[in-house]
Amino acid sequence: MTAPRSRAPTTRARGDTEALCSPEDGWVKVHPSPGTMLFREILHGQLGYTEGQGVYNVVRSSEATTRQLQAAIFHALLNATTYRDLEADWLGHVAARGLQPQRLVRRYRNAREADIAGVAERVFDTWRNTLRTTLLDFAHGLVACFAPGGPSGPSSFPKYIDWLTCLGLVPILRKRQEGGVTQGLRAFLKQHPLTRQLATVAEAAERAGPGFFELALAFDSTRVADYDRVYIYYNHRRGDWLVRDPISGQRGECLVLWPPLWTGDRLVFDSPVQRLFPEIVACHSLREHAHVCRLRNTASVKVLLGRKSDSERGVAGAARVVNKVLGEDDETKAGSAASRLVRLIINMKGMRHVGDINDTVRSYLDEAGGHLIDAPAVDGTLPGFGKGGNSRGSAGQDQGGRAPQLRQAFRTAVVNNINGVLEGYINNLFGTIERLRETNAGLATQLQERDRELRRATAGALERQQRAADLAAESVTGGCGSRPAGADLLRADYDIIDVSKSMDDDTYVANSFQHPYIPSYAQDLERLSRLWEHELVRCFKILCHRNNQGQETSISYSSGAIAAFVAPYFESVLRAPRVGAPITGSDVILGEEELWDAVFKKTRLQTYLTDIAALFVADVQHAALPPPPSPVGADFRPGASPRGRSRSRSPGRTARGAPDQGGGIGHRDGRRDGRR
């Protein structure tokens, strides 16, 4: 398949490119533009990279073109051989080793005829395999001469595929000249020793040499334009294309493999990236939106607090602190009225039930009651206070009976007074709670109104900023789609949240994060990956190899892909002569030696070698036959019949019963001539 080539306008001067490509004449500049440059950035993964996009690495691989070039060189070299040259090299080899049929038979005269034929076949197979290896080494050197035009050369196949994937067309610059490929080929053919040692190689190189030099000149004279240093113009009125190198001013031609569509104001290319562009931009915008949401709304609020031990939490911890403050902890073992009173207050704070009041007060009175009630009174029975006697005993009995009653009355009075105080305090608390509840209701209403106003203001600001960003992106991409204009991202502020009122002695905040909604794009990425894979596989006719479990093992060019893309590369881009028939998809995955064997079997050289081998084996078998018996003894043995003698005559003898002319002399002379 040969793709159409554009016609370069030649009606104007070479240096008048700007005037030539004026919009008044119907010319528009289609490359470079923001859209076409973005296409190449997509191929480089600037807007994201998916698993399906990895198929493109196989598409732009030069493996298929390398195999096509190798097959062309192998075919040309092997088909340039002649029977005469092969026979001359074979006879020279036989003479050099002393393997003529007669000598071979004399050397193995005691062996059977079949064994001698096997030796002859083995001798020829050795020479044939050596010749094939020698020719392969020579052909490998020929292929290496075309390395400057390989994947990294000016006429590289990957650049050709890049242009097709982005725009569906290829700009080509031609300048007929001898470059590195031609010079390397000439030096190789001149200096290689095989051209002086083997007639087969020398004559084949001489016959195929002109074709090799034309192919090398095609590589040297062709340059696929670089994507970022070429201008492409299109005349939608005449359908013409113009290619110009802005650095050197050189003009070229444009190979249009997939014609684009002119919509009246712009050109829509028929290419894989053009078809995938809306989905790529949409998925990229979604990822950017999720990233902005993460930066804007996920500001971390870090609050680091120390956690108290179990022995220092609650009422017990407060009592321990008070003991330390008053200097009356377990270490000092001291006590005072102030410390006992503070402990009473702390114990009353930790009460959970009304019945705990009696226990709390009782423990306090047990601790301090001896100082308040059981203080020793003045003993009147002592000397100096009157008579002791019986009065002393009776006084002691009265005090012993009145002490428990007094202590119980004191406790009851203290408990009643505390209950009264607590009841009044609780009533005051209920009143305060009601007033605070009414105040909180009013504040909550005001807070809701402020929140609504804040949300409206935030939504309006975001909408204005989004509209401005969309307009900037459209101006950058030329209307092809949205793209980040390079604006600074919104700076996320840290939010301060006061949670102190919601914490008690048993809770603390180690770290806190806000978790707002962030859109998920995993499904969109998976869908885009499948789109990439389907588009590349179907557009470039890539063949997927799978095992018995259905798992993909490898992917390669199919026969259809070679005919659709590799053949136009040699015919329309390089304009290479006599490349030969396109290889098949199964040939692409072969190695160099495997491809050589496959080509070797299809050329005339294989037929010539088979014929020479058959003749050599036949000569050896003929030389191994025993000599025929001498006819002299049969003519003169006693009792020989005339019929037996007549059989040994030449084909020109007379018929049976005719008179013998010349007798046995002529017969003997004939036999002597036959022996000679």
UniProtKB/Swiss-Prot annotation:
Keywords: Disulfide bond, Host nucleus, Viral genome packaging, Viral release from host cell, Virion. Forms a portal in the viral capsid through which viral DNA is translocated during DNA packaging. Assembles as a dodecamer at a single fivefold axe of the T=16 icosahedric capsid. Binds to the molecular motor that translocates the viral DNA, termed terminase. GO terms for cellular component: host cell nucleus; virion component. Residues 422-443 are annotated as: Putative leucine zipper motif. Residues 383-404, 627-676 are annotated as: Disordered. InterPro entries: Herpes_Portal. This is Portal protein. Changing residue 254 to A: Complete loss of portal ring formation. Belongs to the herpesviridae portal protein family. The gene is UL6. Homododecamerizes. Interacts with terminase subunits TRM1 and TRM3.
